[in-house]
A protein has these predicted regions:
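Sec-dependent signal peptide recognition
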Residues: 2-8
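C-terminal motif of bacterial Sec signal peptides marking the signal peptidase cleavage site
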Residues: 15-17
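Carbohydrate-active catalytic/glycan-binding domains of CAZyme proteins
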Residues: 20-496
C-alpha cells in the first residue's frame, strides 16, 4: 500500500504469456473445428449419463456495514481485513490471515491483526501478532503508527512473520522479522530485513516470502510505487537478508501512472511449471485491481499473456500484466471496488485468492474476501466472480448450461471504479448472443465452456457456486479470451 491507508487510520467523519522462455500457449481460433469434434463426443456421453451438480450450502450472511461491530472485535469477521496474507498451519489444519492494522472509525492498535478459520468461510478475530506493537528500532526509523501488510512463512518449527512499517507517501520504511513457535503468537522481534530512505530506488514495504522449487532457497519479494517490485535473497537459517542491497527489479510501472504497483505475491504451480507474480495496480481507494505475470524462474523475468515483461515501462501502462480481478457490479446488486493486495493459497491442489475490497461508494469499509482460483488450460489463474462458499469443481451436464448470464469483462482500462455486467444468452441450440453478435458455445471436458464469437474465443471454467448477491445457487463462469482478457459470468436463474 502507498499508502493511502492513512485515511483509514483516522476516525471516520461519517459512518454510513511470454517472451523467449514463455510464449502465448492459448489455442487459436483455427482450433475451433477440433474443439467442436470434442464437443460432439461430449454430447454422446451426456446422452448416456446425466450428472447434476452439487452446489454449496447456504453460507452465513456477510452482515456488511455493521456499526455495532466497530467496537467489538469478536464481531469483526472479515471487516477490517486489509492486505490479507493467507496461511494454512500444517500442525493444526487451521487457516490464518495476517493483515494491516486497520479499524473502522478509530485509531488502530498496532501489532498486525490475526484471524482464524476452519473452512475459509467463517472467520474469527484472534488478536495481534506483536503484543508490544511496533519494535523500538523500527519506530525510530520510520515513525510509523501501525503495522502494514504482514506475511508469514514456516521454517522448521518456527513461524516467521515479515512486517512492514512506514508512513503515507514516505520511503523511510522498513521490513522486519518477528518469530514465534505458534501461528497465533506472540511474535518476538528478530531484526530488520531491509530498510529504505528517501531517494532509494524502491520502498521497503509489502513483503512476501517464496521458496524456490527444487533448491528450497527462500526469497522475499517486496515494493510499492516508486521503482516498483524487487526480489531479495533470504538466509534460510536466520530469515534475514542473505545479500546486500535491494535485490533485483522484477516489475514496475512508469511515472505517468505514479508508478502505481504494489502488494507483490509469488507462488509456484507444479502442474504448469511456472512461478506466478501477483501485483496490485492503481489506488487502493478507487481503481485498485490485481494483475499477474509468470516465469520459469523465481527471479524472473515475469511476462504476461502477450509476452510483455512486467518491467516494461514503454508500453501503455494499462496493457501490461493479465488483469484477473477488479472492481465489478452485477446488475442492480451491490458492487465491489478496489479489489487488491492479494495472497494465494494452494490447499492440497485447491487454490484460493484472498484480497481486500470495498463496497462500491463506501471506501471507508474494507473487507477481506476469499475466492476460488482455478487454472486455464494454458496455465493462467482464473478467479471466481463469487466469494468462496465451499464450491467444488465437478462434471457439468451441458443440458443445464443454456440460459441468460450476467457477464463482466475485465478491460485493461476502467472508465469507472466498477465494471458493470451485461446480459448474454446461451441458447439450447448452442448458439449465443454477445454484444448483439451471434456466436456458438460448446462444452469441452468435464467443466470447461468454450464460446466463439467472430474471431474471439473465450474459454471458461464452470463452477456450481453460491450467488452472494441473489442469495441462491447458480453456475458461475471464469475465463480468459484469445486476447488475454479475463471474463466473469454467472447464470441468471431468475430469467431464462
Amino acid at each position: 500500500m502507498k499508502k493511502s491507508i492513512l485515511f483509514l487510520m483516522l476516525p471516520m467523519l461519517l459512518l454510513s504469456g511470454c517472451s523467449n522462455q514463455s510464449h502465448n500457449m492459448g489455442k487459436s481460433t483455427s482450433d475451433t473445428a477440433v474443439l467442436k469434434d470434442k464437443s460432439q463426443n461430449n454430447d454422446k456421453a451426456d446422452a448416456k449419463e446425466k450428472v447434476l451438480p452439487k452446489y454449496p450450502s447456504k453460507p452465513p450472511e456477510l452482515n456488511l456495514f455493521n456499526s455495532d461491530a466497530i467496537n467489538h472485535k469478536e464481531l469483526w469477521g472479515t471487516m477490517n481485513g486489509h492486505d490479507p496474507a493467507i496461511f494454512k498451519d500444517d500442525a493444526s489444519g487451521k487457516y490464518y490471515v495476517y493483515s494491516t492494522d486497520v479499524e473502522i472509525g478509530s485509531h488502530p492498535r498496532p501489532g498486525a491483526q490475526i484471524r482464524r478459520s476452519n473452512d475459509l468461510i467463517t472467520w474469527e478475530f484472534v488478536g495481534w501478532a506483536l503484543e508490544d506493537g511496533i519494535p523500538e528500532e523500527i519506530q525510530a526509523w520510520t515513525n510509523a503508527t501501525n503495522i502494514w501488510a504482514p506475511d508469514i512463512i514456516k521454517a522448521g518449527n518456527e513461524y516467521r512473520l515479515y512486517c512492514s512499517a512506514s508512513t503515507f507517501g514516505s520511503q523511510k520504511s522498513a521490513i522486519f522479522l518477528a518469530v514465534s513457535n505458534s501461528p497465533e503468537g506472540p511474535f518476538k522481534y528478530r531484526g530488520i530485513v531491509v530498510k529504505t530512505d528517501t531517494g532509494d530506488p524502491v520502498n521497503a514495504i509489502d513483503a512476501n516470502l517464496v521458496v524456490e522449487e527444487g533448491t528450497g532457497q527462500q526469497y522475499m519479494v517486496y515494493g510499492s510505487f516508486w521503482s516498483g517490485i524487487n526480489i531479495l535473497k533470504i538466509d534460510n537459517e536466520t530469515g534475514l537478508a542473505a545479500e546486500e542491497g535491494f535485490g533485483k527489479s522484477i516489475a514496475r510501472r512508469p511515472r505517468s501512472v505514479d508508478g502505481a504497483i504494489e502488494g507483490p505475491y509469488i507462488r509456484y504451480n507444479k502442474d504448469t511449471g511456472y512461478y506466478y507474480l501477483f501485483v496490485s495496480y492503481g489506488s487502493l481507494f478507487s481503481d485498485y485491481h490485481i494483475r499477474v505475470g509468470r516465469s520459469k524462474s523465481v527471479t524472473g523475468p515475469y511476462v504476461d499473456f502477450n509476452g510483455t515483461e512486467l518491467t516494461n515501462i514503454e508500453k501503455n501502462p494499462y496493457e501490461v500484466g493479465v488483469k484477473i480481478a477488479g472492481g465489478y457490479k452485477f446488475e442492480q446488486d451491490l458492487g465491489w471496488m478496489a479489489l487488491g493486495h492479494n495472497s494465494v493459497l494452494n490447499d492440497n491442489g485447491e487454490w484460493f485468492l484472498v484480497h481486500h475490497a470495498r463496497p462500491e461508494g463506501e471506501q471507508n469499509w474494507p473487507y477481506m474476501q476469499v475466492r476460488k482460483l482455478v487454472w486455464s488450460e494454458d496455465g493462467w489463474p482464473l478467479v471466481s466472480p463469487e466469494l468462496y462458499a465451499g464450491e467444488k469443481l465437478q462434471k457439468i451436464d451441458q443440458s443445464i448450461i443454456a440460459g441468460t448470464y450476467d457477464r463482466i469483462k475485465h478491460f485493461d482500462f476502467m472508465l469507472s471504479v466498477v465494471e458493470p455486467s451485461e446480459k448474454i444468452y446461451l441458447k439450447p441450440d448452442k448458439t449465443c448472443m454477445i454484444d448483439r453478435e451471434k456466436g456458438e458455445w460448446f462444452i469441452e471436458g468435464d467443466y470447461r465452456l468454450v464460446i466463439q464469437v467472430g474471431n474471439i474465443t473465450e474459454r471458461y471454467v464452470i463452477i456450481p457456486s453460491w450467488d452472494w448477491e441473489k442469495k441462491t445457487t447458480t453456475l458461475v463462469l471464469t475465463g480468459i479470451d484469445s486476447e488475454g482478457r479475463c471474463i466473469w459470468g454467472k447464470k441468471n436463474n431468475s430469467g431464462n
